């Protein structure tokens, strides 16, 4: 009995286009050859006005940028097809380290004094104060267990979902992503309480009571393990 040939490329139609499941064990050259053959055999007809979106899933195979471009070019050369995404279940060690740095909580215990700048890639948990003239900057969220009386910039790399929270919120300036808020009005003596700042639907920074944070950003609960 003739042995059935291993299928390295599986094509599945979806309501949004097609999905290509590519085997992660065969050689890359074998994969490209079979992909070319199968896409040439199947003719995908569109309405003439729109392209058919293709999602490519490569499993546990890591693709270099050059290899990804080879796949994109091959698919692009077939009529009516355009690559929407190429998805892999693996990343390089360098990418993993970069992701960890961007998402981890960095706990620091100190006072940020006037003229000093504290900068972290991920989420900042500062146990201490930010004095007037001091600056804290984070790629993610900023949590200050103390007084925030200087400048705080969260989401500096464009994260508009980032928040700033402090036990005592009386800053010189707040900035989230590219949105800036000057110092809010000073509170009456004894009126200081834990507050948070976030960007609202009108693209303005709003300062409100800390208790609202879990409703505004429910995903922040995932950071609790990093804080505790």
UniProtKB/Swiss-Prot annotation:
GO biological-process terms attached to the record: cell morphogenesis; division septum assembly; regulation of cell septum assembly
Keywords for the protein's UniProt record, in alphabetical order: Cell cycle, Cell division, Septation
Top-level lineage group: Bacteria
Assembly and interaction partners: Interacts with MinD and FtsZ.
Annotated function: Cell division inhibitor that blocks the formation of polar Z ring septums. Rapidly oscillates between the poles of the cell to destabilize FtsZ filaments that have formed before they mature into polar Z rings. Prevents FtsZ polymerization.
Family from the record: Belongs to the MinC family.
PANTHER family for the chain: SEPTUM SITE-DETERMINING PROTEIN MINC
Protein name according to UniProt: Probable septum site-determining protein MinC
Species name: Bacillus mycoides (strain KBAB4)
């Amino acid at each position: 009995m003739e042995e059935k040939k291993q299928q390295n490329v599986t094509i599945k139609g979806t309501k949004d286009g097609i999905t290509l499941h590519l085997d992660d064990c065969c050689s890359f050259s074998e994969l490209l050859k079979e992909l070319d053959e199968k896409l040439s055999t199947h003719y995908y007809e569109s309405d003439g006005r729109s392209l058919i979106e293709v999602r490519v899933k490569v499993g546990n195979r890591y693709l270099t940028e050059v290899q990804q471009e080879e796949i994109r070019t091959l698919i692009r050369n077939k009529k009516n097809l355009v690559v929407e995404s190429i998805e892999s279940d693996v990343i390089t060690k360098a990418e993993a380290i970069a992701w960890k740095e961007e998402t981890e909580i960095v706990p620091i215990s100190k006072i940020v004094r006037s003229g000093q700048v504290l900068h972290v890639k991920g989420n900042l948990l500062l146990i201490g104060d930010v004095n007037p003239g001091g600056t804290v900057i984070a790629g993610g969220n900023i949590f200050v267990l103390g007084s925030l009386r200087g400048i705080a910039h969260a989401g500096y790399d464009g994260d508009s979902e980032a928040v700033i929270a402090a036990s005592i919120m009386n800053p010189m300036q707040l900035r989230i992503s590219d949105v800036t808020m000057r110092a809010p009005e000073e509170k009456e003596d004894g009126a200081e309480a834990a507050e948070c700042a976030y960007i609202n639907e009108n693209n303005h920074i709003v300062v409100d009571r800390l208790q609202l944070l879990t409703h505004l950003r429910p995903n922040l609960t995932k950071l609790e393990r990093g804080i505790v």
